[in-house]
From Swiss-Prot:
It catalyses: alpha-maltose 6'-phosphate + H2O = D-glucose 6-phosphate + D-glucose. The keyword Lipid metabolism does not apply. Keywords: Carbohydrate metabolism, Glycosidase, Hydrolase, Manganese, Metal-binding, NAD. NAD(+) binds at residues 7-73. Its EC number is 3.2.1.122. This is 6-phospho-alpha-glucosidase 2. Belongs to the glycosyl hydrolase 4 family.
Amino acid sequence: MNQNKQFSIVIAGGGSTYTAGIVMMLLENAERFPLRALKLYDIDEERQATIAEAIAIELKEKAPAIDFTWTTDPQTAFTDVDFCFAHIRSGGYKMREQDEKIPLKHHVVGQETCGPGGIAYGMRSIGDIIELIDFIEKYSPDCWMLNYSNPASIVAEACRRLRPDAKILNICDMPVGTQRRMSQIIGLQPKDLEVRYFGMNHFGWWTSVKDKAGNEYLPQIRDYVAHHGYLTQIEVDTQHMDASWQATHKKAQDLLAVDPHYLPNTYLKYYLYPDYVVAHSDPDYTRANEVEDGREKCVFSAAQKIIDAGTSDVGSFPIDSHASFIVDLACAIAFNTHERMLLIVENNGAVANIDDNIMVEVPCIVGKDGAEPLTQGKIPMFQRGMILNQAMVEKLVVDAWINHDYQELWQALTLSKTLPSAQVAKEVLDDLIEANREYWPELKHDEHEVHLISESAVSEI
């Protein structure tokens, strides 16, 4: 792609609460990533229309030359596009609430991307992401799909196996947000940092944080996190500021205590301290409810205000600067900039002592041909054991989706560190199946019915 090219993009998940902020961010970056066309695509026509009508007013005022459309038709959406930015939520907030509340009913971690909730979400998401890939390959085969839909690791593993030749890069905003906090702790800008990191999505550790001159800041940040977690004096992003997120950032000090050598991803709390998480969760009011009562209402009321007024003078959407990593990634591909970014890629030796076919999150150099992971060497036994366990959970989930196999999904839940036993795993699974009948493939049981030892039977032995 030449330096003077203008790009056509489609945002899959056009009705998302993040869409408007991302569009504003694209306008902010128009000099380095100019747009000729912007499309929104969603299967929820009514939800998307509210966001799209408000964006149309913003674009008419700020960038009238951009050809803007929104649609529920795949051919219209995916024809003549250079990039697809994908942030879909399969099942919407209605099912996110079930992902969180069903496990909590069983006194198990209820979270949208980790544990049984993440597995349920993954089972809904695989087919939808594969469908997007197929639309792209049919209507715009040269298009790159930049996917930041959750649960990213399960989705990435499914894409590796089901669409191995797809032009897709999987990226997550969580490390970006944490690195913003790190930069604030040491008084630098996020772009000043050059990090080393290994793990899986929502499941990893920073082993080095340097500036461009090669000065190492890991010890300084580590000392800060040991006392304060990742809480900072000044909030550095808008995505992770709610009360539940503040508690998560604070909990990082306890994650660091488990291994004080490396800086942990905050999501590790769900695996290392699941009992704490459950004890501090409200089974009747979860993160899904917090988002619906906060961000959801705020974004849609702002959109309706713009629509009713017919102008953004009443209050423009804020720029989601936190999402600038998406433009960084698109520019790296479009202009072969060899940007260094954390991406979810097939291991292939990047982490020396885990399997090559595990989808890892590591620093990569990104250019026109995609991502080249940087080698991280061998990792310690503790982290290796954690990663291998979680990788097998996610592989079993994908197996279960492909094979429509109840047994494999039960095994995946049983293997997860967030569940205490096979019995609890089965009870949670059966409730999740009931809630997800509209979304999951129908799972086949083994011909032999499963009988578990009941509490009463144990007491009689």
